[in-house]
Amino acid sequence: VKSILLFFITTALFISCNNTQQGNGTQKLGGDIKIDGSSTVYPITEAIAEEFRAVQPNVKVTVGVSGTGGGFKKFSRGETDVTNASRAIKESEAADCKANNVTFLELSVAYDGLAVVVNPQNDWTTSITVAELKKIWEPEAQGVIKKWNQIRPEWPDAEIHLFGPGVASGTFDYFTEAIVGESGKSRGDFTASEDDNVLVQGIEGDKYGLGFFGVAYFEENKDKLKLVGVDNGSGAILPTLETVRNGTYKPLARPLFIYVNGASEARPEVKEFVKFYLEVVPQLAQEVGYVPLPEEEYVRQTEKFNTFISAIPAAH
């Protein structure tokens, strides 16, 4: 009887242990992973989260959008496990994290180009210089630069209607720093939204509209919008896989990031998600319209991740 009982106990333990493995040998995990932040990085992270759900169906991964700045506010309070960012964390945001004992790891995940776009009926703007963009968007332009022919005399004597990301957006921060010369400095009389789809719809419906957002959103809506080449002194350049990666599309090419909460990283489901993220992002980033980092850079990011997690005690 004892031997039979021992057999059943051993068999039960074997089945129990075996059931913690997926068919592909991956350990089954549970729990929730909360992600928020940049609308620009959202398509990459959501695509990866969808793939991860297929591998780990018992892990609930939610990806919200509150802009890079809004995402860092939540992240610094420990409300999210991962935050998407279309710019590097600011000193003030890092200080907020420190004040709340939130440690973090910064990981570069892809490159992005900012697209300058107009309505398809706009037959006069095929390119624009960096100086002209500054003339349009700098704070001094508010109430002064109102018409297209104030940018170039041959352009129409018609009001220019501007669309752009809101002030909590990392895209807004990056654009203003690259074009105006100081992050966050801009005229205020433009249609602003953290939702890039609102900007797309606004420009699509306005012959005299002009705006900017991540190039992936242009790619999704290229049948509704017209892309404008940006001239930094070397001729008009369009944002493409090649020009963003090789740096010729400057100053509007930038790196994209995720930030991982150190305490969250101790949880096996978060650790596995970030590991999975770094494995699949080279392919998925390109599939959703972004530019992958060079292969050696992904190796470096993975090494950063491995070093970071090796110093964190495992969660129990």
Residue ranges and their predicted role:
Residues 17-316:
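Flexible loop/hinge segments at secondary-structure junctions
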